[in-house]
UniProtKB/Swiss-Prot annotation:
Name of this protein: Thermostable carboxypeptidase 1
Dependence of activity on temperature: Optimum temperature is 90-100 degrees Celsius.
Catalytic activity: Release of a C-terminal amino acid with broad specificity, except for -Pro
Source organism of this protein record: Pyrococcus furiosus (strain ATCC 43587 / DSM 3638 / JCM 8422 / Vc1)
InterPro entries: Peptidase_M32_Taq
Binding annotation for Co(2+): H269, H273, E299
Motif (HEXXH): 269-273
Pfam families cross-referenced by the UniProt entry: Peptidase_M32
Length: 499
């Protein structure tokens, strides 16, 4: 395999970066183990260990020798695209790491730890007042973070860019304008015409964990997931994907004992994330350009498998025999029943319970509030009422308690302001990629029906996966499909699927 890193300065950078990579590798293992294996009381020592490793990594990244090498590389003109990618990713990491003074980092860490505890108590007792003062502190920290990072148009831009490189408030505004104008009337029509149900008896059917474990393993085997050689499937409270490297990617799912589509769609979703990591160019091993380029692009891969494939008629018909074989109650249901059950549409208070059509309105609500938090004089006390008003306007339902409204997500307690829009970016891009993949694979649906997933995986590898983090998200998309993100594709997909 041809060596892609030729430049001597880049080779020096990568030799030093290997230690930073190794610390990240260890942190991934500790993070995965915390969710999957660690006994509850191990949390104190684990958090100290993770904190110390973060400090070590930060020191190595900002070591004068390392920073000087990256600065030197920025001035080089004869670099290839891979080497330019290395410089871009590291320069960005150094810029962000340098932006925050040590005392600010410490303040954020302490505040979010205490805020998370306050949020847990507030949610359990359905008492917003217990979280309110902490949310005011989080808002204040977010404003300060934006000032440290710097921005051209508005403070929220700086926070968006942390999670999705190059994303601006105007981009998010544009995508939500399309969804409000075109998706909202579609949602009303879907609910009115009732082609898909608002509820289904399969939601209440109970299952034994081992039944669904067999189904999930069968699905992953059909997808060609390299279990045992390069991948693992485990169980955690909240499904997630973590990569220790290109040859070690791990996913988790959950088994709740009812509503079996949740475990299937969680597994399929995480497979999409894992595939992105597994299909990277192996020459990127131990370098900063290994790994998905952004949260939004990553989410587009998981949503592609979950929504475009996992909720399709062809996929449901493919898995129906194995469902029937493993779930005794399935003899009462047809493939059409399962398809309708997989595609229920109903407004729900809880974002994580939302269906494909209503989900993005949950994100729109959070985007509007976050933008106000960071840009204007808005206090935490104003948020519950604003939340409820917006929920009623968008989905026609009004939360009756804080836990199904303002207190439902942990993100703000963690200080993650600017994160939510990446979920919608992923959903919109998944539909856009679908219409582009259909141009190259016109019999896409037939391939899914026959479990011929290799051509689909190869297309995703060629267009998205193999590039790792070489290009920023917008540039990667332009190279992959020749256009910018366009919310119209998702509107079209919803229309064709649900009406």
């Amino acid at each position: 395999m041809e060596e892609v890193f030729q430049n001597e300065t880049i080779k020096q950078i990568l030799a030093k970066y290997r230690r930073i990579w190794a610390i990240g590798h260890a942190q991934s293992v500790l993070g995965w183990d915390l969710e999957v294996n660690m006994p509850k009381e191990g949390i104190l020592e684990r958090s100290v260990a993770q904190g110390e490793l973060s400090v070590l990594s930060h020191e190595l990244l900002l070591h004068p020798e390392f920073v000087n090498l990256v600065e030197k590389a920025k001035g080089l003109e004869n670099l290839n695209e891979y080497e330019r990618g290395i410089v871009r990713v590291l320069d960005r990491s150094i810029r962000i790491a340098r932006a925050f003074p040590p005392e600010f980092i410490r303040e954020v860490s302490e505040t979010t730890s205490l805020a998370t505890k306050a949020w847990e108590e507030a949610k359990a007792k359905d008492d917003f007042s217990k979280f309110e003062p902490w949310l005011d502190k989080i808002i204040s920290l977010a404003k300060r973070a934006a000032e440290y990072l710097g921005y051209e148009e508005e403070p929220y831009d700086a926070l968006l860019d942390l999670y999705e490189e190059g994303l601006r408030t105007r981009d998010v505004e544009k995508m939500f304008e399309v969804l409000e104008k075109k998706l909202k009337p579609l949602l009303d029509k879907i609910l009115e015409e009732g082609k898909v149900p608002r509820e289904h008896p399969l939601e209440k059917e109970k299952y034994e964990r081992e039944w669904m474990e067999r189904v999930n393993l069968w699905i992953l085997q059909k997808f060609g997931f390299p279990l045992g050689t390069r991948a693992r499937l485990d169980v955690s409270a909240h499904p997630f994907t973590t990569e220790f490297g290109i040859r070690d990617v791990r996913i988790t799912t959950r088994y709740e004992g009812y509503d079996f589509r949740r475990t299937i769609l969680s597994t399929v979703h995480e497979f999409g994330h894992a595939l992105y990591e597994l299909q990277q160019d192996e020459r990127f091993m131990f370098t900063p350009i290994a790994g998905g380029v952004s949260l939004g692009i990553h989410e587009s891969q998981s949503r592609f498998w979950e929504n475009i494939i996992g909720r399709s008629k062809e996929f449901v018909e493919l898995i129906y025999p194995v469902l029937k074989e493993n779930l005794p109650f399935m003899s009462n249901y047809t493939p059409e029943d399962v398809y309708l059950y997989f595609n229920i549409v109903r407004p729900d208070f809880i974002r994580t319970e939302a269906d494909v059509v209503t989900y993005n309105f949950h994100i729109l609500l959070r985007f509007k509030l976050e933008r106000l938090m960071v840009s204007e004089e808005i206090k935490a006390k104003d948020l519950p009422e604003m939340w409820n008003d917006e929920m009623e306007r968008l989905l026609g339902i009004r939360p009756r308690k804080y836990s199904e409204g303002i207190l439902q997500d942990i993100h703000w307690a963690h200080g993650s302001i600017g994160y939510f829009p990446t979920y919608t970016i992923g959903t919109l891009l998944s539909a856009q990629l679908y219409y582009h993949i259909k141009k190259d694979i016109p019999d896409f649906e037939e391939k899914v029906a026959k479990a011929e997933f290799d051509p689909i995986k190869a297309w995703l590898r060629e267009k998205i996966h193999r590039w790792g983090s070489i290009y920023p998200p917008k540039e990667l998309l332009k190279k992959a499909i020749g256009e910018d993100m366009d919310a119209e594709y998702f509107v079209r997909w919803v229309k064709e699927k649900y009406l």
